[in-house]
Amino acid sequence: MRARRALIAVCVIAAASLLSACGEHTMHNGDANNDGTFINAGNVVYQLQVSRELNQYSPEDKSYFIGLPKSAANLTASQLWFGVFLWAKNQTKDSRRTTDNFDIVDTLGRKYYPLKLNSAINPYAWTSTPLMPGATQPNPNTTAGVGPTGGELLLFKLNTSIYNNRPLTLQIRAPSGNKVWATISLDL
């Protein structure tokens, strides 16, 4: 009789622990050592294509700065340009919108926000986009989709002190509010 009660107690505890995880939201994290990791965020799958320092005077990088507001175009001696190129896919059966709410956080907790690029003239600029089931951002038939990065650009102006405060973390947030859907560790 004691063995039977013990078995029932073990089964009840096991069932309770399994059920306690139901409904929990798990934040997904990506690692900078593996560009290309798929991250689920808000019913859309995001993938870091490339993240790197950019040079506005380099012929290779010059087109990434098209559509940058003149008020944000200059760097101080203690700033640098940093680009995060993302790809996204809707793997659901319903239309979904990608987010445009991102930030980078360093190990001291300082936040950096992407600069708004004019997507009407910059074919690499990331913008929130509705995706039909199976659709991707960027569209594979666009400049960003066939370009060297395979992703659309989030352009950041960072302090050079970030080299001392690595790794950096890209936070993918809900379109409105501060809820963090997922994070990706970035390195320089």
Where are these predicted regions, by residue range?
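Conserved functional micro-motifs across diverse proteins
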Residues: 22-188
